[in-house]
Design a protein with these regions (language model features):
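Class I SAM-dependent methyltransferase Rossmann-like catalytic core
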Residues: 1-21
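Conserved alpha-helix/loop element of class I SAM-dependent methyltransferases that forms part
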Residues: 19-36
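Class I SAM-dependent methyltransferase SAM/SAH-binding core
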Residues: 40-41, 45-92
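A short acidic, Gly/Pro-enriched loop at the edge of an enzyme's catalytic core
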Residues: 95-103
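A short SAM/SAH-binding and catalytic strip from SAM-dependent methyltransferases
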Residues: 102-116
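A short glycine-rich, Lys/Arg-flanked "PGG" loop and its adjoining helix->strand segment in the class I
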Residues: 118-130
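C-terminal alpha-helical "lid/dimerization" subdomain adjacent to the S-adenosyl-L-methionine
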Residues: 137-183, 190
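Core SAM-dependent methyltransferase catalytic element
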Residues: 183-185, 191-206
Length: 206
C-alpha cells in the first residue's frame, strides 16, 4: 500500500470529491485535544488536520507517522512547532517508544483488512497512556434505509478506486469499534457527516 503517487494531488482531489466535508469531520472533536501533552498523528496525509491542530496548540509536541514518504514531505511543508515526522509502516515496523495521551487516525484505519486492523489498533493502544484520547474520522455505515445503500455504493466505488491507485489492502470497510473496546477505549462522542457516509469519533480510555 502506497500513497506516494497521490501525495501531490491529494488536497485538490479531496476537495473535488468531498468538498470540505472530510476536513469538517477531522476537526469535529479538535477541542478534545486541548489538554493533550503528547499527540500522535498516524496516516496524517497532506497535513490539513496538523495545520488546524497547530493553529489551536502551537507548542504541544506532535509526532506524525506515515508510510508514504511523499505524504510526509507534503505534511512537513505545512507543519510547524515541535513536530517530529517519521516514515514507518505500522504493520511491519515497530512503533517508536513513547506514551501518547492523544492519538489521531483520520482516514487511516479504513485502509486495513480486519486482521491488520486488529494488529494496528493493538500496536497503537500499547503506546497510549491509561487515560488517552483517540480521534478517528473514517467511513461509516448507517443502520438502514437509503443512507445505508448509498454508503455501500460509495464504499464500493472508493475502495475499488484506491485499490487500483494505491494497492490498498482493504476491500471493504471494517468497523474498528470492537478492537478499540478490547483495548480499553469507549466511544465518547460520534458525529455523522454526509448522511452517515463519514463519521467522526472521539474515543476515550480510562
Amino acid at each position: 500500500m502506497s500513497f506516494d503517487r497521490l501525495a501531490p494531488h491529494y488536497r485538490w482531489l479531496e476537495r473535488l470529491l468531498a468538498g470540505e466535508v472530510l476536513q469538517q469531520a477531522r476537526v469535529a472533536h479538535l477541542a478534545a485535544l486541548d489538554q493533550a501533552e503528547n499527540i500522535l498523528l498516524v496516516g496524517e496525509g497532506p497535513g490539513r488536520f496538523l495545520q488546524a491542530l497547530r493553529a489551536r496548540q502551537p507548542a504541544v509536541p506532535i509526532t506524525v507517522i506515515d508510510a508514504s514518504t511523499k505524504m510526509l514531505e507534503v505534511a512537513r511543508a505545512v507543519g510547524s512547532g515541535p513536530t517530529t515526522f517519521i516514515q514507518a509502516d505500522l504493520i511491519r515496523d515497530p512503533l517508536p517508544t513513547s506514551e501518547w495521551d492523544a492519538i489521531v487516525t483520520h482516514c487511516f484505519l479504513d485502509c486495513f483488512a480486519p486482521l491488520s486492523l486488529t494488529q494496528v489498533i493493538e500496536k497503537l493502544a500499547r503506546g497510549a497512556t491509561p487515560r488517552a484520547t483517540w480521534l478517528i474520522t473514517d467511513f461509516g455505515l448507517p443502520p438502514s434505509g437509503w443512507r445505508r445503500q448509498r454508503a455501500r455504493l460509495a464504499h464500493a466505488l472508493m475502495y475499488r478506486t484506491f485499490r487500483i491507485a494505491t494497492r490498498l489492502e482493504a476491500k471493504q470497510w471494517a468497523d474498528p469499534s470492537a478492537n478499540l473496546i478490547e483495548n480499553g477505549f469507549q466511544l465518547a462522542t460520534r458525529r455523522a457527516f454526509s448522511h452517515g457516509l463519514i463519521q467522526a469519533d472521539h474515543w476515550q480510555r480510562g
